[in-house]
């Protein structure tokens, strides 16, 4: 299965007692599929992977693979701070039914570019899944440079990159590396339309947890090269782009999901959305219902 279009980085629903809410998880998965998403990420940073036990990771991924049943690709977040642990987690994800591993640069340890290259080559060689590189320097403390990516794209098991940096020059440098076997995916909702109009294959999104159809519509327009229509739709979604970054991810998007009946909060050290931002969450959650309906109608008419 190819990677393109709208791919949701799923939030993990918890119940009032803080345990996994598997009923909410299954409802979220089905809502995403109904909204037209073209891929799903389980247990990434938006999914609070760092707060999950091994058993919970297994449960989420196994349930997702079973429910999705091959309708769209399932990517598992497997990146950890050490290479051996990342390889083991990637093998674990393969056994649980993931089709791809989303492998973030090792957090906190700040390897050199040579170290990053060696790390990703080892995971690609030994992990047992196709690897999507993930660069998000604001979270990890290190930046996977395009020239290093250029040295990795020839590996048959390295199939793409999720790039969270939004600078046009960074996007252009990565898009120049794309091929039939290597895709570039935006990891930033706010700049994704520009990235796709510039040649990126899609978006791994946070806000699409709450608005799968609306972000599918954005991706369709941008990937089709409909510049004016994509810009107009992007402007319509700009409040959601901005809101989902108003506090640490996934705090804001989980506030939207909670208002839609999916989940009841976060795990420490993350706290619920601050009181100052609750009115915006109320308004945007209400507006999302109409926006999703409009998106579905427009996609049917297209």
From Swiss-Prot:
Recorded metabolic or biological pathway in which this protein acts: Amino-acid biosynthesis; L-lysine biosynthesis via DAP pathway; (S)-tetrahydrodipicolinate from L-aspartate: step 3/4
CC annotations in GO: cytosol
Enzymatic reactions: L-aspartate 4-semialdehyde + pyruvate = (2S,4S)-4-hydroxy-2,3,4,5-tetrahydrodipicolinate + H2O + H(+)
Active-site positions on this chain: 134, 162
Matches recorded under SUPFAM superfamilies: Aldolase
Subcellular localization(s) per the UniProt record: Cytoplasm
Keyword Cytoplasm recorded: yes
Principal cellular location given in the protein's record: cytoplasm
EC number assigned by the record: 4.3.3.7
Keyword Lyase found: yes
Swiss-Prot/TrEMBL keywords: Amino-acid biosynthesis, Cytoplasm, Diaminopimelate biosynthesis, Lyase, Lysine biosynthesis, Schiff base
InterPro entries noted in UniProt: Aldolase_TIM (IPR013785), DapA (IPR005263), DapA-like (IPR002220), Schiff_base-form_aldolases_AS (IPR020625), Schiff_base-form_aldolases_CS (IPR020624)
A GO term for molecular function: 4-hydroxy-tetrahydrodipicolinate synthase activity
CDD domains per UniProt: DHDPS (cd00950)
Ligand binding (pyruvate): 46, 204
The family this protein is said to belong to: Belongs to the DapA family.
Subunit structure: Homotetramer; dimer of dimers.
Role description: Catalyzes the condensation of (S)-aspartate-beta-semialdehyde [(S)-ASA] and pyruvate to 4-hydroxy-tetrahydrodipicolinate (HTPA).
UniProt name for this protein: 4-hydroxy-tetrahydrodipicolinate synthase
Gene name for this UniProt entry: dapA
């Amino acid at each position: 299965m190819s990677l393109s279009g709208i791919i949701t980085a799923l939030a993990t629903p918890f119940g009032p007692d803080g345990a996994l809410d598997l009923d909410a998880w299954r409802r979220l998965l089905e809502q995403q599929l109904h909204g037209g998403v073209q891929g799903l990420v389980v247990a990434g940073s938006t999914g609070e992977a760092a707060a999950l036990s091994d058993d919970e990771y297994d449960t989420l991924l196994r349930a997702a693979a079973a429910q999705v049943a091959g309708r769209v690709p399932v990517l598992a977040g497997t990146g950890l701070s050490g290479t051996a642990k990342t390889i083991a987690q990637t093998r674990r994800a393969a056994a649980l039914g993931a089709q791809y591993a989303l492998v973030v640069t090792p957090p906190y340890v700040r390897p050199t570019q040579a170290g990053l290259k060696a790390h990703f080559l080892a995971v690609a060689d030994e992990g047992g899944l196709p690897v999507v590189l993930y660069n998000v320097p604001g979270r990890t403390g290190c930046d996977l440079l395009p020239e290093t990516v250029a040295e990795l794209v020839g590996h048959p098991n390295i199939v793409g990159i999720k790039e969270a940096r939004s600078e046009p020059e960074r996007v252009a440098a990565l898009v120049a590396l794309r091929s039939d076997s290597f895709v570039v995916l935006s990891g930033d909702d706010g700049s994704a339309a520009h990235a796709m109009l510039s040649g990126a294959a899609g978006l791994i999104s946070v806000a699409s947890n709450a608005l799968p159809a609306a972000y599918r519509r954005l991706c369709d327009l941008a990937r089709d090269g409909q510049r004016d229509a994509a810009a107009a739709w992007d402007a319509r979604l700009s409040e959601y782009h901005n809101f989902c970054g108003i506090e640490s991810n996934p705090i804001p998007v989980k506030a939207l999901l909670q208002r839609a009946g999916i989940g009841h909060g976060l795990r420490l050290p993350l706290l619920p959305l601050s009181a100052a931002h609750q009115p915006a969450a109320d308004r945007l959650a209400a507006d999302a219902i109409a926006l999703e309906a409009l998106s579905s109608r427009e996609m049917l008419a297209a």
